[in-house]
Amino acid sequence: MKFWIARDLEDDKLHLFPGEPHNKLFWWNYRNEKIEIDKNMFPEVTFENSPQQIELKLVKEE
């Protein structure tokens, strides 16, 4: 599953999006679908290099 992550400029929040977000000092998409995630999870993601596409894989526990 591919998602996008992006960091806000002003409050340093990190968001996960199902589609590519747009920028106006903060990140949004046309349906405003976003999930705020722990801002310490991806320290390499900055406002300047946002958004970045990532792939999430579900791990099945046995």
Language-model region placement:
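Generic structural signal for short, solvent-exposed loop/turn connectors between secondary structure elements
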Residues: 1-2, 32
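N-terminal acidic leader/helix
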Residues: 2-14
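Short, surface-exposed terminal/edge motifs of secreted or surface/virion proteins that either
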Residues: 12-23
